[in-house]
Amino acid sequence: MQAILSSWFIQGMIKATSDMWHKGWDERNGGNISLRLLAEEVEPYRRDFYQQPRKVELTQPAPELANSWFLVTGSGKFFRNVELNPAENLVLLQVSNDGMAYHIHWGLTQGGLPTSELAAHFQSHIVRMQVSGGTNRVIMHCHATNLIALSYVQKLENASFTRLLWEGSTECLVVFPDGIGIVPWMVPGTDGIGTQTAEQMREHSLVLWPFHGIFGSGPTLDDAFGLIDTAEKSAEIMVKVLSMGGKKQTISREQLIALAARFDVTPMAAALDA
């Protein structure tokens, strides 16, 4: 067995994709994850790399990510199959030193490419690296059922949607005080939706793609998963509340402010006033 299969990052990706599939967020080949790795984390596994790595040109240059390593889910791959055959469904790649291409060093044993949303991932990685001082290393996308459902019946506006989720569960303001960003519906797998997502990622660690899914970012796979899981739980609660006739009482603005003070977080101001 290849040593890389027992690495923390392959095992972590197996767990994340399995958990997300069991949640019902990643049907068929839905969803994608990218994890930025440090050179010293990858170095011990070089003996498992391809002797002649395949080079692929990027659709959009990413000089900010030059020489960076990423573990990414493959395009058209099913999350439910990652744990069965990680080498076929994942890919370890390194961006070229000019940021114009990447080389596939491991994975995709049956051929193929990284996720079709790679441009969106890379653009979001660049922004989240900047705003987090390099601590954010994960971009995660999935089709979270209740968040998608709410996008059909709620105003697609950052502040009001954030306020709805904050009121759905007390923990939400603490977990994502920066709120949720929303982009217009766009064709997936394009540079355009990647640009729009990255713009929202500058202010928000969660970005909703209406009628499609959610993007989340964080320092670790657990953090990104937990962020989405928390927002999705609140969305599920709100879907049930709406189905029962709507709210008769809720968490007030004053209570949200008190909550933020207790946990020393700075809440999105516009959402407090929504």
Swiss-Prot record:
UniProt superkingdom: Bacteria
Cofactor: Zn(2+)
CDD domains: Aldolase_II
Main EC class the enzyme belongs to: lyase
Chemical reaction(s) catalysed: L-rhamnulose 1-phosphate = (S)-lactaldehyde + dihydroxyacetone phosphate
Pfam families: Aldolase_II (PF00596)
Enzyme active site: 117
Cofactor binding annotation: Binds 1 zinc ion per subunit.
Gene Ontology, cellular component aspect: cytosol
Keyword RNA-binding attached: no
Cystine pairs: none
Main location: cytoplasm
GO terms for biological process, alphabetical: pentose catabolic process; rhamnose catabolic process
SUPFAM superfamilies xrefs: AraD/HMP-PK domain-like (SSF53639)
Location of the protein in the cell: Cytoplasm
Assembly description: Homotetramer.
Function description: Catalyzes the reversible cleavage of L-rhamnulose-1-phosphate to dihydroxyacetone phosphate (DHAP) and L-lactaldehyde.
Protein's name according to its UniProt entry: Rhamnulose-1-phosphate aldolase
